[in-house]
Curated annotation (Swiss-Prot):
GO biological process, one term: translation
A matching Pfam family: Ribosomal_L9_N
Species: Bacillus velezensis (strain DSM 23117 / BGSC 10A6 / LMG 26770 / FZB42)
GO CC terms of this entry: ribonucleoprotein complex; ribosome
Protein name (database record): Large ribosomal subunit protein bL9
């Protein structure tokens, strides 16, 4: 019997996949527990519609990421921190501080985990911070750390 999986079933199929399984397994387990539905014309057309919708959403998300990349690459985030001799900071500027400053000054919300900053910024001046907006889109944000008065 052909079924369309509504959820991932370990060893059998992934969500949205159409597969042939034993009749008893389909009726007594998959359909009964709501893990799959019978693959009839109505359900197949609904699956196609859902896949098209997901594809459109993925394209829209990619476009939003590209637009955000354009915006971020034109901005400079300015932060101030206490520093000692030679421009070394006491502590460091973290991705959390950068994300908060970006939200406060430019009204752009970016998750701190998307800022790919290894150890934090430990010196005064300009630093380019990579921002992973989407698996296919990466922007570079310019961060200026100046001395706190």
């Amino acid at each position: 019997m052909k079924v369309i999986f509504l959820q991932d079933v370990k060893g059998k199929g992934k969500k949205g996949e159409m597969k042939n399984v034993a009749d008893g397994y389909a009726h007594n387990f998959l359909i009964k527990k709501g893990l799959a539905v019978e693959a009839n014309a109505t359900n197949i057309s609904a699956l196609k519609g859902q896949k098209e919708k997901e594809k459109k959403e993925a394209i829209a998300e990619l476009e939003r990421a590209k637009d955000l990349k354009e915006t971020l690459e034109q901005l400079t985030v300015e932060l101030s921190a206490k520093s000692g001799e030679g421009g070394r900071l006491f502590g460091s500027v973290t991705s959390k501080q950068i994300a908060e400053a970006l939200q406060k000054t430019h009204k752009i919300k970016v998750d701190k985990r998307k800022l790919e900053l290894q150890d934090g910024i430990r010196t005064l001046g300009y630093t380019n911070v990579p921002v992973k907006l989407h698996p296919e889109v990466q922007a570079v944000l310019k961060v200026h750390v100046k001395e706190e008065a």
